[in-house]
């Protein structure tokens, strides 16, 4: 899934949890992103690092992916999290690129770790590259 293509922002209506379970009510290319992610073996996120976080485009895709969870809560790792809708738990690889300070790297690491837990992904691998062109070398070194 490319975050570069235009897609609507999550409106926070939670229809994907209760009205149209597992599907966003927006009828665009991200409508079934939750179930599509659940079918993957590995999720690879490539993002420009924006103040220690995902770019707005990648964040939009992540926000629209909340259908991977349910509106109910459970304990995981001693914390309360939403229950997961799907049994498959893909691996997660994140590569941030750009001029990134040490503080931004720490923030990006924290965000990636929390997203990994919240979305039910596993085995986080985190990389940093100076520019987008360097991502390939970092991921396939």
Predicted regions and their residues:
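Short, glycine-/small-residue-rich phosphate/pyrophosphate-handling segment
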Residues: 70-118, 122
């Amino acid at each position: 899934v490319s975050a570069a293509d235009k897609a609507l922002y999550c409106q926070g209506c939670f229809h994907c949890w209760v009205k149209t379970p597992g599907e966003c009510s927006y009828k665009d290319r991200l409508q079934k992103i939750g179930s599509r992610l659940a079918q993957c073996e590995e999720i690879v996120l490539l993002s420009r690092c924006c103040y220690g976080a995902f770019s707005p485009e990648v964040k939009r895709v992540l926000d629209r992916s909340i259908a991977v969870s349910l509106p109910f809560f459970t304990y995981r790792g001693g914390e309360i999290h939403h229950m997961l809708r799907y049994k498959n738990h893909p691996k997660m690889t994140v590569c941030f690129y750009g001029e990134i300070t040490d503080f931004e790297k720490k923030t990006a690491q924290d965000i990636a770790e929390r997203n990994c837990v919240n979305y039910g992904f596993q085995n986080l691998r985190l990389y940093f590259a100076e520019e987008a062109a360097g991502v390939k070398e970092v991921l396939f070194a």
